[in-house]
Amino acid sequence: MITLDRQEGLWKITLNRPEKANALTAAMLRELAEIAEAARQARGLIITGAGGVFSAGGDLDEMTDGLATSALWERLSTAIAAVPGLSIAALNGTLAGGAMGMALACDIRLAVPQAKFFYPVMKRGFLPQPSDPLRMSALIGPARTKLILMGGQKLTAQEALQFGLIERVLQPEDLLLNAENIASDTIAASPEIARGIRTLCG
């Protein structure tokens, strides 16, 4: 349910459970975390999904069985944030719930026009993963973060772009090409220089 393609310093992870809107199981989260933790030599990392949805969040059956409070979510986002190369979320469709943590942990987020963004954690009776509100607030500010997490608002791709939650809106056929193009300079650069710039950017 997870595919990994590695080519010349670029690691591309694809969530590959389109029949379930790429809903994340514990096994998928564990595999994703292991890949991200192993990506210390990756010069670029792209995360995308198969089908028309990036991810619907956690698998509903597993969420009620304890996945909602699993440490795997935080382990995954921490591992993505620690990747030394440029990390890009290429959002091929809607991004919902706990899957938001993956995108927030990336350096750059690109999305298709039909993507929607929502995080209904409060409605379902759970707290978000600890780093998610902090990363979201750093991008869009506390008030807009509360609009999503507490107000239950669903954003369109254009609203997400205006808020600063994503950096570009692209047609589906251009999404991965643009992600690869953005990563190409970092892949070609000196690793030390790339790491230095990444550190200076915060």
Residue ranges with predicted function:
Residues G44, G93, I108, L147, ...:
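Well-ordered beta-strand positions
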Residues M1-A50:
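Conserved CoA-thioester-binding segment of acyl-CoA-metabolizing enzymes
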Residues I13, I47, D59, M102-L104, ...:
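Hydrophobic/aromatic residues within transmembrane alpha-helices
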Residues R30, E34, Q41, G49-A82, ...:
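Glycine- (often His-adjacent) and acidic-residue-rich active-site loop
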Residues A79-R124:
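Glycine-rich beta-to-alpha active-site loop
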Residues E74, G97, L127-P130, K154:
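Glycine-rich phosphate-binding loop at the start of an alpha helix
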Residues L134-A143:
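Hydrophobic, secondary-structure "cap" segments at the distal end of domains
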Residues L110-A115, I166-G202:
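C-terminal long alpha-helix characteristic of the crotonase
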